[in-house]
Amino acid sequence: MYLCGLPALVLNRMFPRWARYSPLIGLFTVCAALFISAYARNVTELIITQGVFYGIGGAIAYMPCIMYIDEWFVKRKGLAYGIMWSGTGLAGVGLPLILEKLLEVYGYKTTMIIWAVVLFTITAPLAWYIKPRVPPLPVRRLKAFNLRFCLSRRFILYQLSNTIEAIGFYIPGIYIPIYAASVLGAEEFAQALCILLFNISSVVGCIGVGWLIDRFHVTTCVMVSTIGATLGTFLLWGCAFNMPMVFVFCVSYGLSAGSYSTTWTGVMREVAGKDMQSSSTPSSLTGGEAGDVGGGNGDNAGPPRPAESPLSEFTGSYSEEVDPIMVFVLLAAGRGFGNVISGPFSQVMYHSMPWKGEAALAYGSGYGSLIVFTGVTALGSGICFLGRRVGWC
């Protein structure tokens, strides 16, 4: 899903009038993939349905949401994105329990069919309300994206921080329940509670960081997340000798690391241009037309943009020639890349279990290397903060 953002963005920019229907198309693809996966007979078929097609459908459904929020919100854009991204954690609070109960009662096949039907029934009507601020005009062709920013020192530092954070971010969500069961003897409910606490905390964290990103520089917000995740990992998980400490770590990690992606709004602002213009113009208007619309009496009205700006066909939120949604897409790809390479590393550390019986506290439980790896990658996510201090971004 992370890696399909680029083609989804290109298609939505090429056919802006059809972009509004992308959420419905994507939702249908996602639900169809779930429905078909109920009849999967092997792992390969599961990867194709719940992996490939589910991810493609998710990207198609998700991209217009990112695009339109950028158009609808200006002053509180970070808070708007934070509230939207908090929905991921909110869904993770009750959904795992519901699916687990369905699996116990009805089995895998029936559960997948039920969930596919219920998901489409609930979300399809809501997709109608996902729309641009002003209906776009048809465009004949898509101008080339300005990708020069990819080679800028500023973007490279932000992307490096983002990818390093992603490499270790998913490890606690996978191994904390295993650690709780194998080391502390936790029951199934306590294991599930770890994930629930993380998801609930990430809801609060995303909204909080979204509020901060509208008021402070993005590197400051990144450092808040970095410090919380790093200290929480080394001090709380590293010293977790009972379940209450594990629960405290899950809350701390959800508040800090779980909200890291909300800082992308600030990165979009920094890379695409700090001077934010009016969002009251449709994404396909250019030159004088955009100026006529943007020059109204609204509070968010701004000056007309130059007719030659390639961005005039993309968004009305930024004055530079860089599409901020392209910045988002590449950051998402970096996070996806970090997630992919995290798996092999964590598997090796989990099976080798170094320092077991040799180090103190949780570091000697066999999970010490996972704890250190998670903490180091969390610390590495603050590279962009250091880069700004020395004038690199």
Predicted regions span which residues?
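Helix-to-loop junctions at the C-terminal end of transmembrane segments
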Residues: 2-19, 205-218, 236, 350
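Cytoplasmic membrane-interface "Motif A"-like loop-to-helix N-cap segments
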Residues: 13-27, 214-227, 242
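Helix-breaking motifs and short loop linkers at transmembrane-helix boundaries and internal kinks
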Residues: 16, 39-41, 73-74, 185, ...
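C-terminal ends and interior cores of transmembrane alpha-helices
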Residues: 28-41, 227-241
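Hydrophobic core of transmembrane alpha-helices in multi-pass small-molecule transporters
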Residues: 30-37, 43-64, 68, 163-164, ...
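Intracellular juxtamembrane helix-capping segments at the cytosolic ends
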Residues: 51, 58-73, 80-81, 259-289, ...
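Helix-loop-helix hairpin linking two adjacent transmembrane segments in secondary transporters
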Residues: 76, 83-134, 165
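Extracytoplasmic gate region of multi-pass secondary transporters
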Residues: 152-223, 260-265, 339-351
